[in-house]
């Protein structure tokens, strides 16, 4: 069994050694331009077209939760990956836990009005504020996949009203489910906090725009943990300036790194993190990949395979 590995920033040698240990029968090598030798599996992140084109692979693993970088290249270069080759993404591998930590900490930050107290502190102003009531602080999760379900589970501990929206209806205990474009407005109407965990597909690009934001309650909050292309940044800034949106926590952006001249940096109601909400944990990823390869070798049916038509 031959495995090729490519990631522009990961410690390649660590991964190769870990994979060799986890899959002793495998010959693992770092792919470099010009390497056209045979391979059974490819582990990749933002791979060059030449790495995958023409190969008879058993599967490709994207080394992250998203596969948009591969699918976008496939649109321009359909020869990059044969339609018969299964494409897998890292469904969790520790990312769910990280998303839970990020989402819960920020929801509680807003619920306890720490954002307002920070602004008061900046002007040396001492003034207790009325508390928010939990029953009126509905959390809406936009995108109900694996990570969305993890975030919902963690927020249930705090007894917030929860709802989710996705392409198809979900049956999550304690979570009100909305499905399809026809139910999006009803979903948004009660969301004091909107958490975006949508996949990056042509249908979801620019979905968080002026029209969507206007359907939220006045003074709502936005937490974007998915992709920057989901948000029309000028529309969000306008909603923040008008007070329609009271605050935004943004981990992803249309351009990354976020340019220094972006007005988001200096906006008093925006908090920025540099795409760190959920990073790939190497040891857990290696365990998932080795287990999945073993199942593929046995011909078993698996979860986590990407539907290329849907984009996730």
UniProtKB/Swiss-Prot annotation:
Alphabetized Gene3D superfamilies for the sequence: NAD(P)-binding Rossmann-like Domain (3.40.50.720)
Q: What is this protein called?
A: Glyoxylate/hydroxypyruvate reductase A
Pfam families given in the database record = 2-Hacid_dh_C
What organism is the protein native to?
Answer: Escherichia coli O1:K1 / APEC
Q: Cellular location of this protein?
A: Cytoplasm
Q: Which PROSITE patterns match?
A: D_2_HYDROXYACID_DH_3
Which NCBIfam families does this one have? PRK15469.1
Q: What is the lineage of its organism?
A: Bacteria, Pseudomonadati, Pseudomonadota, Gammaproteobacteria, Enterobacterales
- Molecular-function GO term, any one: glyoxylate reductase (NADPH) activity
- The principal localisation class reads cytoplasm
Q: Which reaction does it catalyse?
A: glycolate + NADP(+) = glyoxylate + NADPH + H(+); (R)-glycerate + NAD(+) = 3-hydroxypyruvate + NADH + H(+); (R)-glycerate + NADP(+) = 3-hydroxypyruvate + NADPH + H(+)
Concerning InterPro entries, the annotation shows:
D-isomer_DH_CS, D-isomer_DH_NAD-bd, GhrA_Enterobacterales, NAD(P)-bd_dom_sf
């Amino acid at each position: 069994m031959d495995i090729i590995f490519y990631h522009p920033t990961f410690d390649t040698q660590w991964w190769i050694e870990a994979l060799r240990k986890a899959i002793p029968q495998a010959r693992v090598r770092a792919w470099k331009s010009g390497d056209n030798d045979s391979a059974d599996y490819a582990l990749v992140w933002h791979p060059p077209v030449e790495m995958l084109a023409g190969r008879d692979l058993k599967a490709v693993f994207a080394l992250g939760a998203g596969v948009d970088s591969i699918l976008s290249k496939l649109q321009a270069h359909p020869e990059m990956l044969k339609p018969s080759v299964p494409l897998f993404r890292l469904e969790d591998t520790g990312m769910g836990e990280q998303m839970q930590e990020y989402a819960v900490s920020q929801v509680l930050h807003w619920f306890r009005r720490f954002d307002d107290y920070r602004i008061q502190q900046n002007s040396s102003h001492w003034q207790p504020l009325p508390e928010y009531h939990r029953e009126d602080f509905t959390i809406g999760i936009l995108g109900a996949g694996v990570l969305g379900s993890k975030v919902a589970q963690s927020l249930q501990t705090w007894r917030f009203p929860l709802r989710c929206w996705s392409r198809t209806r979900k049956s999550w205990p304690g979570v009100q489910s909305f499905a399809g474009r026809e139910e999006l407005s009803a979903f948004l109407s009660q969301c004091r906090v909107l958490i975006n965990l949508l996949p990056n597909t042509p249908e979801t690009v620019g979905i968080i725009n002026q029209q969507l934001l206007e359907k939220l309650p006045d003074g709502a909050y936005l937490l974007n943990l998915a992709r920057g292309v989901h948000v029309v940044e000028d529309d969000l800034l306008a909603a923040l300036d008008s007070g329609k949106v009271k605050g935004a926590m943004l981990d992803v952006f249309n351009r990354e790194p976020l340019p220094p001249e972006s007005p988001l940096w200096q906006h008093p109601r925006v908090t920025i993190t540099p795409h760190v909400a959920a990073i790939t944990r190497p040891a857990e990823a290696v365990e998932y990949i080795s287990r999945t390869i073993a199942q593929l070798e046995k011909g078993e049916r698996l979860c986590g395979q990407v539907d290329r038509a849907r984009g996730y």
